[in-house]
Curated annotation (Swiss-Prot):
Cellular component GO terms held in the UniProt record: cytoplasm; excinuclease repair complex
Keyword Cell cycle: no
Pfam families per the UniProt record, alphabetical: UvrA_DNA-bind (PF17755), UvrA_inter (PF17760)
Family: Belongs to the ABC transporter superfamily. UvrA family.
Identification of the protein by name: UvrABC system protein A
Organism the protein comes from: Mycoplasma genitalium (strain ATCC 33530 / DSM 19775 / NCTC 10195 / G37) (Mycoplasmoides genitalium)
Length: 952
């Protein structure tokens, strides 16, 4: 039931002028589902995030103590006269959740914390050697296992008192000595308690007290002595016993849980035993990551058909027979073992390739000559290229070097835990027949089903009731926002922006907060129409809890479901920033000034092409694609067409294109890429000569990167300024107008315009440079003008303004025109690229690629290009795509937007569901052919609703 509006129940905004907003006044109803829409760059985010949310955050920070604020940075007051009725604000944006490889969907949602509690409290330990469930062990059972060790074995019985704890433990050592003990095992080394034991207080230590040293004799006296020692240990450690053997290995026993047949025992079941971020539970080899970075032969050997002299070994390809010490050492190996340099790598025998990669087992003569001419001869083992890469990757302190060596490495599943992340003890505990990691590998849908069907006894039900309820609730929230195809083991860094946002949305629903203002940025991104209504219902649940939802959105279904719709425009950039229309969706549709309203009412629409492209008759065929959930499928992609890859979320679209097609073609065309086991065969790669992936990844990560530098138009602009009369008189070259080199840039901020303040434990904070006032250049450089504008003034222009300004300069105006053509006319030339959305970054890349002359044999790959685009902007994008296809090129697009799908020349629909139930081709053909397959395809069902009958 929707809450009734009260006359004074509004967020009142007066005089909003942030960015391009033109003194906007608006009353936004509280406790409602409010959508802000408008063309890209019209000012939606400026109103929602930079004004309303920013003011909410500023007021929150103002309420904190000055001590707390120093760690959170300053929050400037947005350019607005007044905001009244503002509730506590929470922003749910599209930023990736975490880049930490330890963060998973389970940890960021905190569901894994509840799972650890559940497995620790009601899980049942099982012997990994197949001896059934493990029960608690008696002292005599443990003594029997120690007594059964080989006769005359020398063992030491230890009491583990400190496990992975920091400190110097001086008082503990004194206490042990007072109790009459003589020795301790500290971090694997035996000390007497008379020794001065100095420990680093910041390092984690393991300490065990030596209770007895025994030679195993098969007599009653030895057995009694073992029992007495175990009883002493039990009093010190609550049942944990260690036995140190002669060879240094330690046997672990526990009164808590142990197998009476093979002696396997585990420590007390605690939640931290199941944490892959805890030293207690994480695998000792991979430290809980589940993988390790190892050199990859396929990346080290660029092309096995080439010889070493021809550059087959990638790291040596530019220094073959040069003076590099690395090459000279390698040449010593080659000469010693007579490995031919002119023979293709694939023709070398296995032992020769092993020497190249793994090095020599014996010392060999290594000859080198330094740059100064000094000769050096040493006899030593040559470590091999693979070991060289691994060592330097670990040792380097340079991020650039680490990334360079990373290019020759791959993630390899941990050979000890086999990707399970946890130690054997934790994995031996089962609930419903599976371990905790196996549960996290189930899809959200299947994990809910598993928990609902879980059979527990009365005691387990009582203990686990609350944790089970919380887990099922949180999993259900994830399902309701369309993430049922994911699993809790999914690494957070691999989630898309839309998926990460919906996870945060589900987390907020679980918090059951009321009276909050939620500001969201396109939550429908990456969501199939099938799941869209579930997302809308979820947002309505949040509204019905008594919250205000302020959603920036372009999706028609979401706009029509809103209680209140705000249209900002009428256009983008300086031509936007006005309140065009507001009210119910019906009221906005009736407003003739609203472009959004015209699209919603059907008065304006993206037209269906009368004739679809017939293509050039050539194809690329992928056979046996089997990455992730792909079911060994064969896919045919027709060329010189707009090919749409569709399907529900998680159906395998990215697996097919981004993880199979793209790397396969890059391997063939550019001699780079991944191993061939992701598919069986690819046919027709010779039908293209180039593949261009236009992704939504950032185009730069520093304040110096901007659209002008990325598309190379800034070089031309700098040349123009350097050729002015005043610049020539002063002797300025084009480098004077670069903020990347000394000379013309500000010496205080080094051309950044901002000063970076390291926060150590928090993200770095950037503040405007007080010397240049954010203008990046020194005052002398800014004195040079072209048609009355300084270089900084030009960077402040929008793409459209700059196009008009430089219209008479063809090499500049042509590049700027392309930015306008892809719908970025509003974008500031000098904007920091870290502020760009994924969709904006994608379109900037597209405009750069369009600068190059087409060969007619290029394959473009776009991943959800509709992200951040209004229907009017989609129209512009489709015009560009049609231009590409007319040049003879091919465009492959992963997309959910029906307005793009309906103009496709060919559609490949994957499904039928997401996750394990996806990965198959359910329908394919032209849109007209697809809608005849509605019984098999969700996409076809929704597409049939918008295709006009007379177009079929």
């Amino acid at each position: 039931m929707k809450p009734e509006w009260k006359n004074n129940d509004f967020i009142r905004v007066k005089g909003a002028r942030e960015n391009n907003l033109k003194n906007i006044n608006i009353d936004i109803p509280k406790n409602q589902f409010v959508v802000i829409t408008g063309l890209s760059g019209s000012g939606k985010s400026s109103l929602a995030f930079n004004t309303i949310y920013a003011e909410g955050r500023r007021r929150y920070l103002e309420s904190l103590s000055s001590y707390a604020r120093q760690f959170l940075g300053n929050s400037d007051k947005p350019d607005v006269d007044l905001i009244e009725g503002l509730s506590p604000a929470i922003s749910i944006d599209q930023k990736t959740t975490s880049h930490n490889p330890r963060s998973t969907m389970g940890t960021v949602t905190e569901i894994y914390d509840y799972l650890r509690l559940l497995w620790a409290r009601i899980g049942t330990p099982y012997c990994p050697n197949g001896h059934g469930s493990i029960q608690t062990q008696t002292i005599n059972q443990i003594a029997n296992q120690i007594f059964d060790l080989p006769n005359k074995s020398k063992v030491q019985l230890l009491a583990p008192t400190v496990k992975n704890q920091r400190g110097i433990f001086t008082n503990e050592f004194i206490k042990y000595k007072q109790l009459g003990f003589l020795r301790v095992l500290v971090d694997g080394q035996i000390y007497t308690l008379d020794d001065e034991i100095k420990l680093d207080k910041n390092t984690k230590h393991n300490i065990s007290v030596v209770i007895d040293r025994i030679i195993i004799n098969k007599d009653n006296q030895t057995y009694s002595r073992i029992v007495d020692s175990i009883e002493t240990i039990d009093r010190l450690t609550n049942g944990k016993i260690e036995v140190l053997k002669e060879d240094g290995t330690i046997l672990n026993f526990s009164k808590n849980h142990g197998c009476d047949k093979c002696g396997f025992s585990i420590s007390e079941l605690e939640p931290r035993l199941f944490s892959f971020n805890s030293p207690l539970g994480s695998c000792s080899y991979c430290k809980g990551l589940g993988f390790s970075y190892e050199p990859d032969v396929d990346k080290i050997i660029a092309d096995s058909k080439l010889s070493i002299n021809q550059g087959a070994i990638d790291i040596f390809k530019n220094i073959v027979h040069g003076t590099s010490l690395d090459w000279q050492r390698f040449l010593s190996l080659v000469n010693h073992y007579k490995i031919p340099l002119d023979k293709p790598i694939e023709q070398l025998d296995k032992s020769q390739l092993n020497l190249i990669l793994e090095g020599s087992d014996e010392p060999i003569e290594i000859k080198t000559i330094s740059n100064s001419g000094a000769k050096n001869i040493r006899f030593e083992h040559y470590e091999g290229i693979a070991n060289l890469i691994k060592r330097r990757h670990l040792e380097t302190n340079s991020q650039v070097s680490r990334e360079w060596y990373s290019a020759y490495m791959s993630e390899i599943t941990c050979k000890k835990c086999h990707g399970k992340k946890l130690i054997k003890d934790a994995l031996s505990v089962k609930l419903g027949g599976i371990d905790i990691i196996s549960f996290t590998e189930l899809s959200i849908d299947k994990s809910i089903d598993f928990l609902l069907k879980l059979e527990l006894n009365d005691e387990q039900k009582k203990i686990g009731e609350l944790a089970l309820k919380e887990i099922i609730n949180r999993l259900s929230f994830l399902k309701n926002v369309g993430l049922d195809y994911l699993n809790l083991a999914r690494r957070a860094s691999t989630l898309s922006g839309g998926e990460a946002q919906r996870i945060r949305l589900a987390t907020q629903i679980g918090s059951q907060l009321t009276g909050v203002l939620y500001v969201m940025d396109e939550p429908s991104i990456g969501l199939h129409q099938k799941d869209n209504m579930r997302l809308i219902k979820t947002m309505m649940v949040m509204r019905d809890l008594g919250n205000t939802l302020l959603v920036v959105e372009h999706d028609s279904e979401t706009m029509l479901a809103a209680d209140y719709l705000i249209d900002i425009g009428p256009k983008a950039g300086n031509e936007g920033g006005e309140l065009v229309a507001c009210g119910t969706p019906l009221q906005v549709m009736e407003n003739s000034n609203s472009i959004t309203g015209q699209y919603l009412s059907g008065k304006k629409q993206i037209s269906i092409p009368k004739n679809r492209h017939s293509g050039n008759g050539k194809t690329i065929i992928i056979k046996g694609a089997k990455v992730n959930n792909l079911k060994n499928i064969n896919v045919t992609i027709p060329l010189n067409k707009l090919v749409l890859i569709t399907g529900v979320s998680g159906s395998g679209k990215s697996s097919l294109i981004n993880q199979t097609l793209v790397p396969a073609l890059e391997r063939i065309l550019y001699r780079k890429g991944v191993k061939k086991d992701t598919y069986k065969e690819i046919i027709g790669a010779n039908n293209i000569d180039k593949i261009i992936v236009v992704s939504q990844d950032p185009i730069g990560r520093t304040p110096r990167s901007n659209p002008a530098t990325y598309i190379s138009v800034f070089d031309d602009i700098r040349d123009l300024f350097a050729n002015t009369k005043e610049a020539k008189a002063r002797g300025y070259t084009n480098s004077r107008f670069s903020f990347n080199v000394p000379g013309g840039r500000c010496d205080k901020c080094f051309g950044d315009g901002v000063i970076r303040i390291e926060m150590h434990f928090l993200p770095d904070v950037y503040v405007k440079c007080e010397v240049c006032n954010g203008k990046k250049y020194n005052s002398q450089t800014l004195e040079i003008k072209y048609l009355g504008k300084s270089i900084f003034d030009v960077l402040q222009m929008s793409c459209k303004e700059a196009y008009e300004f430089f219209k008479a300069i063809p090499n500049i105006s042509r590049k700027l025109r392309l930015l306008c053509d892809v719908g970025l006319e509003y974008l500031q030339l000098g904007i920091n690229v870290t502020f760009l959305s994924g969709g904006e970054a994608q379109r900037i890349k597209l405009s750069k690629f369009l600068q190059k002359k087409s060969t007619g044999k290029t394959l473009f790959v776009l991943d959800e290009p509709s992200t951040g685009l209004h229907l009017e902007d989609i129209n512009k994008l489709l015009t560009i795509i049609q231009r590409i296809i007319k040049n003879g090129d091919t465009v492959v697009v992963i997309e959910h937007n029906l307005d793009i799908i309906k103009v496709a020349d060919y559609i490949i629909d994957l499904g039928p569901e997401g996750g394990d139930n996806g990965g198959q081709i359910v329908a394919q053909g032209t849109p007209e052919q697809l809608i005849n397959q509605v019984n098999k395809s969700y996409t076809a069902q929704y597409l049939s609703k918008i295709l006009k009958p007379d177009s079929i």
